[in-house]
């Protein structure tokens, strides 16, 4: 297999493959949100047939080319249409796809490469063997098959307490269609935490991508004032928690959890199978997501940099390089 940029004539085939074998984050309607900085790449078999793909968000800092995931995008792929049937042949086919991806990174040689893989990819030896730093990350996946009462029962005592307190204190959770409300709460939270957020990309997700068929939001209110928000995107199988925020002056320990539980119930009622919390390795955030009862699920990021840069990064980003 080999990886190369897509031609315009490949777009329809790529999107069909992404629909069948990828996630919503591989589809054109998502990739197009990020303009020229997002590059979609095709994965071609030995006969030149397009069988899959991946995406790379290209950035520049201090004149250096950096490849990474796009904002609000959990993974870059790759995805492909499998042909093999034998277990050994399936393994070899998957590794061929990863080898092709590694070939492309090494051939293009960006100064820094930090690409998160699809969580379904658990065999990352092709990258390890070729000198990439393979870093495990974790998300939490919640099976939506149980009834809401069972889902609540499976949460941690702390999370159940949070949700119960929200109800006892008179907080009300509502579906929110005015995504300006979500934006305000999300931006306020990022600013308080002194974290950078790309507002252009945030607005693209909320106001260009989001529609009733692919997303929903819930807010928790006190006396009609929104004090916490939860925004979710989804395909036909999986709901992805993408954005959340809270009002600092009106914060309540149960407000965020109540909005999240409403989103979980809504995803279940919509017939979705899994709720993906898009987890974090930051201890406090990881503990919060864990409390909702999901299954810890690893996914991997592959990192590589020019040697002088990699040596420098070992001092500031030891966990990644």
Walk through the language-model features, giving the residues of each.
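Aromatic (often tryptophan-rich) hydrophobic motifs at membrane interfaces
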Residues: 53, 205-314
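A short, internal acetyl-CoA/4′-phosphopantetheine-binding micro-motif in the GNAT/acyltransferase core
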Residues: 73-89, 145-146, 244-253
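Conserved acetyl-CoA-binding loop-helix of GNAT-fold acetyltransferases
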Residues: 88-102, 252-265
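Terminal substrate-recognition subdomain of acyl/acetyltransferases
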Residues: 106-107, 114-169, 274, 279-321
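Short, high-confidence coil segments that cap the C-terminus of an alpha-helix
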Residues: 38, 107-110, 215, 272
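Conserved acyl-donor/pantetheine-binding loop and adjacent beta-alpha core of acyl/acetyltransferases
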Residues: 58-77
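A conserved beta-strand-loop-helix scaffold within acyl/acetyltransferase catalytic domains
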Residues: 2-47, 53-63, 118-137, 146-147, ...
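Short, charged beta->alpha transition segments
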Residues: 65, 100-103, 127-128
